[in-house]
C-alpha cells in the first residue's frame, strides 16, 4: 500500500482556505492509496468549537468524500464536529468503499481540550487493502495501553498538532509504539504557528514495525511524505519474532 502524508501549515480557523490549500496539494499528488492529513486540518487546534465546529455531515466530510472519489484514494484527517449537543475532535476515515470515524479519546487538558470537547469512548480499526488500521489522534500517543496492539491491527495512525517544545517526546513515542506493537506507524504533524502563537516543527514520519523510518520530513518544512508498506513483510517479521505471544493479558475498564 502506498502512503502519502501531508505535513503542512494551517490557516487559523479558516475552513475554506485550508480546504482550498489541500485541494491543490492533492491535485498535484502522485499515485497513492492512502492520504493522511493533520489533526483539525481545516482550522488548527482551536479551543473555540462553538465557532469552528460543523455538523456531522458538514462541509469537511463532504470534501473528504469528493477527494476520495475523485482520486480513488482513502483519506483521513480530524475536524471539530458538533453532534447531539456535544463537540468532538473527530478523525474521519473515507475511502471509495467505506466510511468511518474515531472521536479522540484522550483530550489534552493542558490546553483545556477536555473542557471544550467530549471524549470518544472506543477505539476504531478500519480495514483497507488487506491492512487493519487503528485510528488515533495526537495526545492518544502518550497512552500505550489504549493503543496497544491486541493482534487486531497492522498500521497505527496518529494525526497531530504537536508543539515544537515536545518534539522529542513525539518522535520517541512514535518509535516506541511501532516497536512494542510490531506495527507500521504513520505520524503526521503540522508545521508553522497557530493563532495562539504556538509553533509546530512537524517531524512527521512513516515507520516500519522495527521503528525504523521509511520516510521522514525536514523540521519546519511543508512536505508530502511518501512510503510503501508491505503486509507480507510485516507478517514475516511477526512470525519470526512473535513477541505478542508473551504479552500480558489486560482489559480496559
Regions found by a protein language model. Name each.
Residues 59-73, 142-222:
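CN hydrolase (nitrilase-like) catalytic-core segments centered on the catalytic cysteine
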Residues 33-34, 133, 155:
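Structural motif
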Residues 1-5:
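Extreme N-terminal starter segment of soluble prokaryotic enzymes
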Residues 82-151, 165-172, 236-243, 253:
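Active-site catalytic loop in hydrolytic enzyme cores
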Residues 7-12:
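Short polar catalytic/cofactor-binding loops
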Residues 77-79, 90-93, 124, 204-206, ...:
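Short beta-strand scaffold segments in enzyme catalytic cores
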Residues 15, 23-95, 100-101, 163-177, ...:
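Cys-nucleophile CN-hydrolase/nitrilase-fold catalytic domain and related Cys-dependent amidase chemistry
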Amino acid at each position: 500500500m502506498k502512503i502519502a502524508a501531508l505535513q503542512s501549515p494551517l490557516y487559523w480557523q479558516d475552513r475554506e482556505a485550508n480546504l482550498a490549500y489541500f485541494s491543490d496539494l492533492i491535485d498535484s499528488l502522485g499515485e497513492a492509496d492512502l492520504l493522511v492529513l493533520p489533526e483539525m486540518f481545516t482550522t488548527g487546534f482551536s479551543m473555540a468549537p462553538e465557532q469552528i465546529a460543523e455538523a456531522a455531515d458538514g462541509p469537511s466530510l463532504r470534501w473528504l468524500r469528493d477527494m476520495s472519489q475523485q482520486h480513488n484514494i482513502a483519506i483521513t484527517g480530524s475536524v471539530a464536529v458538533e453532534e447531539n449537543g456535544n463537540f468532538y475532535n473527530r478523525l474521519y476515515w473515507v475511502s471509495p468503499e467505506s466510511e468511518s470515524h474515531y472521536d479522540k479519546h484522550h483530550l489534552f487538558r493542558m490546553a483545556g481540550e477536555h473542557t471544550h470537547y467530549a471524549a470518544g469512548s472506543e477505539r476504531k480499526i478500519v480495514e483497507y487493502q488487506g491492512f487493519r488500521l487503528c485510528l488515533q489522534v495526537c495526545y492518544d500517543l502518550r497512552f500505550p495501553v489504549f493503543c496497544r496492539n491486541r493482534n487486531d491491527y497492522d498500521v497505527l495512525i496518529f494525526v497531530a498538532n504537536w508543539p515544537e517544545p515536545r518534539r522529542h517526546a513525539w518522535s520517541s513515542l512514535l518509535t516506541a509504539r511501532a516497536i512494542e506493537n510490531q506495527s507500521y506507524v504513520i505520524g503526521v504533524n503540522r508545521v508553522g504557528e497557530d493563532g495562539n502563537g504556538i509553533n509546530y516543527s512537524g517531524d512527521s514520519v512513516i515507520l516500519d514495525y522495527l521503528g525504523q523510518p521509511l520516510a521522514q520530513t525536514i523540521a519546519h518544512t511543508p512536505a508530502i511524505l511518501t512510503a510503501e508498506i508491505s503486509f507480507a513483510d510485516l507478517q514475516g517479521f511477526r512470525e519470526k519474532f512473535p513477541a505478542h505471544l508473551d504479552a500480558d493479558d489486560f482489559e480496559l475498564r
